[in-house]
Protein backbone atom coordinates (compact mmCIF):
# COMPACT_ATOMS: atom_id res chain seq x y z
CA UNK A 1 0.00 0.00 0.00
CA UNK A 2 1.28 3.46 -0.90
CA UNK A 3 2.33 5.71 1.95
CA UNK A 4 -0.03 8.52 2.89
CA UNK A 5 0.73 11.75 4.73
CA UNK A 6 -1.34 14.48 6.40
CA UNK A 7 -0.95 17.99 5.01
CA UNK A 8 -2.46 21.45 5.21
CA UNK A 9 -3.54 23.26 2.05
CA UNK A 10 -5.23 26.60 1.50
CA UNK A 11 -8.57 26.45 -0.35
CA UNK A 12 -11.17 29.02 -1.28
CA UNK A 13 -13.26 29.75 1.82
CA UNK A 14 -16.98 28.86 1.69
CA UNK A 15 -19.08 31.41 -0.20
CA UNK A 16 -22.70 32.44 -0.49
CA UNK A 17 -24.48 33.05 -3.82
CA UNK A 18 -24.76 36.75 -3.02
CA UNK A 19 -20.95 36.99 -2.81
CA UNK A 20 -20.82 36.87 -6.62
CA UNK A 21 -18.03 35.53 -8.86
CA UNK A 22 -14.54 35.66 -7.40
CA UNK A 23 -12.02 38.22 -8.63
CA UNK A 24 -8.56 39.52 -7.84
CA UNK A 25 -7.40 43.05 -8.70
CA UNK A 26 -3.74 44.04 -8.99
CA UNK A 27 -2.68 47.70 -8.64
CA UNK A 28 -6.22 48.41 -7.45
CA UNK A 29 -7.47 51.92 -8.16
CA UNK A 30 -8.43 54.02 -5.16
CA UNK A 31 -11.75 52.87 -3.72
CA UNK A 32 -11.61 49.44 -5.41
CA UNK A 33 -11.06 46.29 -3.36
CA UNK A 34 -8.19 43.94 -4.16
CA UNK A 35 -10.34 40.80 -4.00
CA UNK A 36 -13.73 39.55 -2.82
CA UNK A 37 -12.62 36.20 -1.38
CA UNK A 38 -10.16 34.67 1.05
CA UNK A 39 -8.47 31.33 1.61
CA UNK A 40 -8.82 28.91 4.52
CA UNK A 41 -6.54 26.01 5.52
CA UNK A 42 -7.92 22.47 5.34
CA UNK A 43 -6.40 19.16 6.36
CA UNK A 44 -5.92 16.72 3.47
CA UNK A 45 -4.24 13.37 2.88
CA UNK A 46 -1.55 13.14 0.20
CA UNK A 47 -0.65 9.73 -1.27
CA UNK A 48 2.78 8.81 -2.59
CA UNK A 49 2.33 8.19 -6.32
CA UNK A 50 5.67 6.43 -6.79
CA UNK A 51 4.36 2.81 -6.52
CA UNK A 52 1.99 3.56 -9.42
CA UNK A 53 3.93 6.39 -11.06
CA UNK A 54 3.43 5.24 -14.64
CA UNK A 55 -0.30 4.56 -14.33
CA UNK A 56 -1.48 8.17 -14.21
CA UNK A 57 -2.78 9.67 -17.46
CA UNK A 58 -3.28 13.29 -18.51
CA UNK A 59 -6.68 12.61 -20.08
CA UNK A 60 -7.95 10.62 -17.09
CA UNK A 61 -6.40 12.11 -13.98
CA UNK A 62 -5.30 15.51 -15.29
CA UNK A 63 -1.64 14.82 -14.55
CA UNK A 64 1.10 12.35 -15.44
CA UNK A 65 4.71 11.66 -14.58
CA UNK A 66 7.54 10.91 -16.99
CA UNK A 67 11.27 10.28 -16.97
CA UNK A 68 13.27 12.77 -19.04
CA UNK A 69 17.06 12.50 -18.63
CA UNK A 70 17.78 14.95 -21.48
CA UNK A 71 16.21 17.85 -19.61
CA UNK A 72 18.18 17.08 -16.45
CA UNK A 73 21.64 17.41 -17.98
CA UNK A 74 23.88 19.48 -15.65
CA UNK A 75 24.43 22.28 -18.17
CA UNK A 76 20.69 22.65 -18.69
CA UNK A 77 19.87 22.72 -14.98
CA UNK A 78 22.65 25.25 -14.32
CA UNK A 79 21.34 27.52 -17.08
CA UNK A 80 17.86 27.40 -15.58
CA UNK A 81 19.19 28.14 -12.08
CA UNK A 82 21.18 31.09 -13.43
CA UNK A 83 17.95 32.70 -14.60
CA UNK A 84 19.17 33.55 -18.11
CA UNK A 85 15.88 33.51 -20.01
CA UNK A 86 17.43 33.45 -23.48
CA UNK A 87 19.63 30.49 -22.60
CA UNK A 88 16.68 28.65 -21.03
CA UNK A 89 14.63 29.24 -24.16
CA UNK A 90 17.47 28.01 -26.37
CA UNK A 91 18.52 24.97 -24.33
CA UNK A 92 15.44 23.84 -22.43
CA UNK A 93 12.37 24.83 -24.45
CA UNK A 94 13.15 22.47 -27.38
CA UNK A 95 13.53 19.56 -24.94
CA UNK A 96 10.15 20.33 -23.36
CA UNK A 97 8.53 20.67 -26.77
CA UNK A 98 9.80 17.24 -27.83
CA UNK A 99 8.72 15.71 -24.52
CA UNK A 100 5.19 17.08 -24.86
CA UNK A 101 4.86 15.94 -28.47
CA UNK A 102 6.04 12.45 -27.56
CA UNK A 103 3.57 12.13 -24.68
CA UNK A 104 0.50 13.79 -26.21
CA UNK A 105 0.81 13.26 -29.96
CA UNK A 106 0.48 17.02 -30.46
CA UNK A 107 1.28 18.45 -33.87
CA UNK A 108 2.34 21.80 -32.44
CA UNK A 109 3.62 23.10 -29.11
CA UNK A 110 4.02 26.79 -28.27
CA UNK A 111 5.78 27.57 -24.99
CA UNK A 112 4.64 30.94 -23.70
CA UNK A 113 6.17 31.20 -20.24
CA UNK A 114 8.29 29.62 -17.54
CA UNK A 115 8.80 30.21 -13.82
CA UNK A 116 11.78 29.32 -11.66
CA UNK A 117 11.06 28.88 -7.96
CA UNK A 118 13.41 28.62 -5.01
CA UNK A 119 11.89 28.43 -1.57
CA UNK A 120 13.18 30.91 0.97
CA UNK A 121 11.69 30.43 4.43
CA UNK A 122 11.84 34.14 5.32
CA UNK A 123 10.01 35.33 2.20
CA UNK A 124 6.32 35.08 1.39
CA UNK A 125 6.22 35.95 -2.29
CA UNK A 126 9.32 36.49 -4.40
CA UNK A 127 13.01 36.35 -3.70
CA UNK A 128 15.04 39.52 -4.39
CA UNK A 129 16.24 37.96 -7.66
CA UNK A 130 12.65 37.68 -8.87
CA UNK A 131 12.27 33.94 -8.40
CA UNK A 132 8.88 32.99 -7.04
CA UNK A 133 8.13 31.00 -3.91
CA UNK A 134 6.30 27.63 -4.13
CA UNK A 135 2.54 28.14 -4.41
CA UNK A 136 0.82 27.08 -1.17
CA UNK A 137 -2.72 27.73 -2.38
CA UNK A 138 -4.76 25.16 -4.31
CA UNK A 139 -5.36 26.52 -7.80
CA UNK A 140 -5.37 25.93 -11.54
CA UNK A 141 -3.60 28.53 -13.66
CA UNK A 142 -6.27 29.17 -16.31
CA UNK A 143 -10.03 28.90 -16.63
CA UNK A 144 -11.43 27.92 -20.06
CA UNK A 145 -11.97 31.62 -20.79
CA UNK A 146 -8.48 32.48 -19.60
CA UNK A 147 -6.96 29.67 -21.65
CA UNK A 148 -8.64 30.72 -24.89
CA UNK A 149 -7.56 34.27 -24.16
CA UNK A 150 -3.98 32.97 -23.97
CA UNK A 151 -4.27 31.46 -27.45
CA UNK A 152 -5.41 34.81 -28.89
CA UNK A 153 -2.79 36.68 -26.89
CA UNK A 154 0.18 34.63 -28.10
CA UNK A 155 -0.99 33.46 -31.54
CA UNK A 156 -3.49 36.11 -32.67
CA UNK A 157 -3.24 35.47 -36.42
CA UNK A 158 -3.71 31.72 -36.08
CA UNK A 159 -6.01 31.44 -33.07
CA UNK A 160 -9.31 30.94 -34.90
CA UNK A 161 -7.90 28.11 -37.01
CA UNK A 162 -6.00 26.47 -34.14
CA UNK A 163 -9.09 26.41 -31.95
CA UNK A 164 -10.98 24.40 -34.58
CA UNK A 165 -8.85 21.43 -33.49
CA UNK A 166 -7.99 20.25 -30.01
CA UNK A 167 -6.20 22.79 -27.85
CA UNK A 168 -4.66 22.26 -24.43
CA UNK A 169 -2.46 23.96 -21.88
CA UNK A 170 -0.06 21.67 -20.04
CA UNK A 171 2.58 22.76 -17.55
CA UNK A 172 5.81 20.77 -17.23
CA UNK A 173 7.23 20.88 -13.69
CA UNK A 174 10.75 19.72 -12.87
CA UNK A 175 12.90 19.85 -9.71
CA UNK A 176 16.23 21.62 -10.17
CA UNK A 177 17.68 19.71 -7.22
CA UNK A 178 16.86 16.17 -6.24
CA UNK A 179 15.53 14.41 -4.42
CA UNK A 180 12.79 16.87 -3.43
CA UNK A 181 12.37 16.73 0.35
CA UNK A 182 11.14 20.28 0.96
CA UNK A 183 7.65 21.48 -0.06
CA UNK A 184 6.97 18.91 -2.82
CA UNK A 185 4.30 19.48 -5.46
CA UNK A 186 0.91 17.81 -4.95
CA UNK A 187 -1.62 17.22 -7.73
CA UNK A 188 -5.32 16.40 -7.47
CA UNK A 189 -6.95 13.51 -9.34
CA UNK A 190 -9.42 15.34 -11.59
CA UNK A 191 -11.95 12.51 -11.33
CA UNK A 192 -12.42 13.49 -7.66
CA UNK A 193 -12.94 17.20 -8.42
CA UNK A 194 -16.58 18.27 -8.41
CA UNK A 195 -18.05 21.01 -10.60
CA UNK A 196 -19.06 22.92 -7.46
CA UNK A 197 -15.38 23.01 -6.39
CA UNK A 198 -14.35 25.06 -9.45
CA UNK A 199 -14.50 28.87 -9.24
CA UNK A 200 -13.30 30.91 -12.25
CA UNK A 201 -11.58 33.99 -10.86
CA UNK A 202 -11.20 37.10 -13.00
CA UNK A 203 -7.90 38.95 -12.83
CA UNK A 204 -8.30 42.71 -13.09
CA UNK A 205 -5.83 45.56 -13.06
CA UNK A 206 -6.68 49.06 -11.90
CA UNK A 207 -10.46 49.17 -12.05
CA UNK A 208 -11.79 46.63 -14.54
CA UNK A 209 -8.96 46.05 -17.02
CA UNK A 210 -9.25 42.30 -17.61
CA UNK A 211 -5.84 40.61 -17.51
CA UNK A 212 -6.96 36.99 -17.50
CA UNK A 213 -8.96 34.42 -15.59
CA UNK A 214 -7.62 31.76 -13.25
CA UNK A 215 -9.38 29.09 -11.15
CA UNK A 216 -9.81 29.02 -7.38
CA UNK A 217 -10.68 25.69 -5.78
CA UNK A 218 -12.94 24.95 -2.82
CA UNK A 219 -12.44 21.90 -0.62
CA UNK A 220 -14.46 18.72 -0.52
CA UNK A 221 -13.63 15.61 1.46
CA UNK A 222 -13.72 13.35 -1.62
CA UNK A 223 -10.75 14.98 -3.34
CA UNK A 224 -7.69 12.73 -3.77
CA UNK A 225 -4.17 14.13 -3.72
CA UNK A 226 -0.86 12.64 -4.92
CA UNK A 227 2.81 13.58 -4.95
CA UNK A 228 5.93 11.84 -6.24
CA UNK A 229 8.07 10.99 -3.23
CA UNK A 230 11.71 12.07 -3.45
CA UNK A 231 11.23 13.34 -6.99
CA UNK A 232 14.49 13.54 -8.93
CA UNK A 233 15.61 16.06 -11.54
CA UNK A 234 15.02 13.59 -14.38
CA UNK A 235 11.39 13.08 -13.31
CA UNK A 236 8.85 15.59 -14.58
CA UNK A 237 5.23 16.20 -13.66
CA UNK A 238 2.85 17.16 -16.46
CA UNK A 239 -0.07 19.23 -15.19
CA UNK A 240 -3.18 19.68 -17.35
CA UNK A 241 -4.42 23.26 -17.08
CA UNK A 242 -7.11 23.23 -19.75
CA UNK A 243 -8.44 21.04 -22.55
CA UNK A 244 -10.90 21.99 -25.27
CA UNK A 245 -11.84 18.30 -25.58
CA UNK A 246 -14.37 16.83 -23.17
CA UNK A 247 -12.22 14.34 -21.25
CA UNK A 248 -12.26 13.19 -17.62
CA UNK A 249 -8.91 14.82 -16.90
CA UNK A 250 -9.85 18.28 -18.12
CA UNK A 251 -7.77 20.15 -15.50
CA UNK A 252 -5.49 19.58 -12.53
CA UNK A 253 -5.68 21.53 -9.30
CA UNK A 254 -2.25 21.64 -7.69
CA UNK A 255 -0.40 23.01 -4.69
CA UNK A 256 2.92 22.76 -2.86
CA UNK A 257 2.69 21.33 0.65
CA UNK A 258 4.83 21.03 3.75
CA UNK A 259 5.72 17.36 4.09
CA UNK A 260 5.50 16.22 7.73
CA UNK A 261 8.68 14.13 7.41
CA UNK A 262 10.91 16.80 5.86
CA UNK A 263 14.35 16.65 7.53
CA UNK A 264 15.44 19.84 9.28
CA UNK A 265 18.51 20.09 7.06
CA UNK A 266 16.65 19.37 3.79
CA UNK A 267 17.81 21.52 0.85
CA UNK A 268 15.27 24.21 0.00
CA UNK A 269 13.19 23.28 -3.02
CA UNK A 270 14.14 24.62 -6.43
CA UNK A 271 12.01 23.97 -9.50
CA UNK A 272 11.13 25.14 -12.98
CA UNK A 273 7.65 25.13 -14.51
CA UNK A 274 7.15 25.58 -18.26
CA UNK A 275 3.73 26.50 -19.65
CA UNK A 276 2.78 25.08 -23.03
CA UNK A 277 -0.02 25.66 -25.52
CA UNK A 278 -0.60 22.35 -27.30
CA UNK A 279 -2.49 21.83 -30.55
CA UNK A 280 -3.53 18.68 -32.41
CA UNK A 281 -5.84 17.82 -35.31
CA UNK A 282 -8.60 16.01 -33.45
Located regions from the model:
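Eukaryotic N-terminal targeting leaders
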Residues: 1-16, 282
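Active-site loop/lid in soluble adenylation, ligation, and acyl-transfer enzymes
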Residues: 2-6, 77-79, 275
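Non-heme Fe(II) oxygenase catalytic core, chiefly the N-lobe of the double-stranded beta-helix
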Residues: 9-10, 14, 18-214, 222
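Catalytic core of Fe(II)/2-oxoglutarate
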Residues: 213-282
Amino acid sequence: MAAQYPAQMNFLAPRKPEDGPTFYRSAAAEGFETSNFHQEPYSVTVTDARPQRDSFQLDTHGFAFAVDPEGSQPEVLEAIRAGDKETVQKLYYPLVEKLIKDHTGASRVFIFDHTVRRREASLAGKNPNGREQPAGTVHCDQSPLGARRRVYQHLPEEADELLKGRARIVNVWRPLKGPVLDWPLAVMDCTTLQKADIHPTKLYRGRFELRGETVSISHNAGQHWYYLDRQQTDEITMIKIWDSKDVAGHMCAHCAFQHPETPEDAPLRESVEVRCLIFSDE
